[in-house]
Structure formats: C-alpha cells, structure tokens
Amino acid sequence: MATAGHKGAPKTKVRRKEKKNVVAGQAHIKSTFNNTIIAITDPSGAVISWASAGTVGFKGSRKSTPFAAQMAAEAAGRRAMEHGMKRVDVFVKGPGSGRETAIRSLGAVGLEIGPISDVTPVPHNGCRPPKRRRV
C-alpha cells in the first residue's frame, strides 16, 4: 500500500503594492451615526487608501465617536501620502459626529485641504425616517 505524499500548500505569488504617484486627489468621508469611513481616491475616483473607525481598532459604540473618526482619517491620510498624495478635495457625506474631526486630522497629517463639499443625499420626501428614541 502506497503512502499518500504530503502535497504542501500551493505556491501563491505575493503581489507587492506598487507605489502610485498621485499628487492631488479626493477624500471621501462618509460619516454615519455608527461609523466613519474615509476613502482617498485619485481624481478619476480609483481608491488609493481607505480606513474606517473599525479598521483602526474601535468596536461597537466607540466607532461613532469623533476620536475614532480622527484616527481613521490619520491612518488613511498617512497611507495616501506614502503614494505621493499632497493635496485633497474633501467630500463629506452623512450626519455623523466625525465629520469635522476627520477633515481637521487630514490637515494635521500634512495633506493640503482643498475645497470642502457636503454631498449628503437629501430625499425629496422618500422613505419614512426611523421613529424617535424615547429614553
């Protein structure tokens, strides 16, 4: 009876992230009541770096804090600067508490902040909003 030979793990190529040389781009900040997500893109919209309050180590209700948004923006900004990013136009979406802090911390990381636009979608009286909380 022949013994089955151990086949070892299939060899996979490790793709190293290539350094994109993008000087100017866009920072899209989506700030909800539960989380803040920052995506930094090149002018055509291809994502260069991103971070959220969850990816930088916050869980549960701490993700919705301004401090979590600050840490996420710093992480995304640092990663974008590694690809040569120097200037960003900011697009803010959503009603969350991390909007202003995220913009401020993108500037603190060393990115030059261009025009800031609020692109929060406003319904023409669409869906019924969630009921009011009674505490």
Swiss-Prot record:
Keyword Isomerase: no
GO molecular function, one term: structural constituent of ribosome
Coiled-coil positions: none
SUPFAM superfamilies found in the cross-reference section: Translational machinery components (SSF53137)
Biological process, per Gene Ontology: translation
Superkingdom field: Bacteria
Entry keyword set: Ribonucleoprotein, Ribosomal protein, RNA-binding, rRNA-binding
This protein's record includes keyword Transmembrane helix: no
Pfam family, one: Ribosomal_S11
GO cellular component, one term: ribosome
Family statement drawn from the similarity comment of this UniProt entry: Belongs to the universal ribosomal protein uS11 family.
Assembly and oligomerization: Part of the 30S ribosomal subunit. Interacts with proteins S7 and S18. Binds to IF-3.
PANTHER family xref list: 40S RIBOSOMAL PROTEIN S14/30S RIBOSOMAL PROTEIN S11
Function: Located on the platform of the 30S subunit, it bridges several disparate RNA helices of the 16S rRNA. Forms part of the Shine-Dalgarno cleft in the 70S ribosome.
Protein's UniProt name: Small ribosomal subunit protein uS11
Organism: Cutibacterium acnes (strain DSM 16379 / KPA171202) (Propionibacterium acnes)
Gene: rpsK
